[in-house]
Amino acid sequence: QVMKAYGAELDLTPRALGMKGSMARAEEIAAQTPDAWIPSQFANPANPAVHRRTTVEEIARDFPEGLDYIVTGVGTGGHITACAEVLKERWPSLKVYAVEPTLSPVLSGGEHSPHPIQGIGPGFVPDVARPELFDGVIQVAPEDAMAYARRSAAEEGQLVGISTGASLAAVAQLRPEMPDGSRVLTFTYDSGERYLSVDALWSD
């Protein structure tokens, strides 16, 4: 609705085709449209490069004593890859864990299927991602992602989206392995206001 408000024409692809279907359709449209340009965020090396210059340096400033764990979802793969590339060199004991949906365990070697955790689990390993730098992959079920998104709002006053709930659920899964006093970072990707129409998210 936001894009339509700005005057965009929407070309919706079948949900069953997932992100790959959307990307293929975008390529078709670009081929038919003069001077069209696709950012290609899953493959564009500028994606992790910008995170190396910005996100990574912000984290380093905010955590001068370093971190023990970074737990975060994989959408395009840009920010987790940049964090792993740079921060693991600065803080050799840092462990970086990727988060993916149980319904799309591609990083774990499984098959993709449609899932409601928007923003992560695109159904393939992005070209810019470097999974060999990850210390592990944590799978999160949709109901757990939604439960932690609700908890974030009710207990912390932070209205977050489903993918953020997935990362919080992943931290909770990993918590028993973490020594007391560990410094842990995850990310809030977007506001829960975008998901107010998702009935399943707010019905516990």
PLM feature spans:
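Glycine-rich ThDP/TPP pyrophosphate-binding loop and its adjacent helix/strand module
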Residues: 50, 54-94
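Phosphate-handling active-site elements
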Residues: 89-98, 176-183
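Short beta-strand segments
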Residues: 40-42, 73-75, 98-100, 185-190
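Small/polar-residue-rich loop-to-helix segments that shape phosphate-bearing ligand pockets
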Residues: 1-69, 100-153
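Glycine-rich phosphate/adenylate-binding loop
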Residues: 145-166, 179
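Phosphate-binding loop/pocket of nucleotide- and phosphate-handling active sites
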Residues: 123, 169-204
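Short glycine/serine/threonine-rich phosphate/pyrophosphate-binding segments
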Residues: 73-83, 163-171, 195
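Redox-cofactor binding/interface segments in oxidoreductases and associated redox assembly factors
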Residues: 72, 139, 161, 186
